[in-house]
Amino acid sequence: MRNISIDIETYSDVDLKKCGVYKYVQSPHFEILLFGYSVDGEAVQVVELAQGEEIPDKIIDALTDETVTKWAFNSQFERICLSEYLRRCYPQKFINYSIQEDTVEDYLSPVSWKCTMTWSAYM
């Protein structure tokens, strides 16, 4: 696995536009409802987390693997949401990148995340 394209649908009782992504995911009512992904251009798979389905282990592992490039439209949102999801549901697999100088800690490293929204702005 070299690339994974990701799209999520989420819910929170916190207004994203008023409070931003960090407060949005910190709500105890935050949840990821749907997790869509495609590995290396293969067929899209959709995991209905709200219906009790689980993300496959190889995909969970890929989320913390910096050698796997993660692609998403507005990847910052996906990265922060998935960080919170991993922290809650897979704490044994969650790896944060925080350094002492970082004021926003406990999130997945942005190193291997690519934003298609940003890339499309250059086209």
Which residues fall in each region the model found?
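Conserved DEDDh/DEDDy metal-dependent 3′-5′ exonuclease domain
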Residues: 2-5, 10, 15-19, 23-123
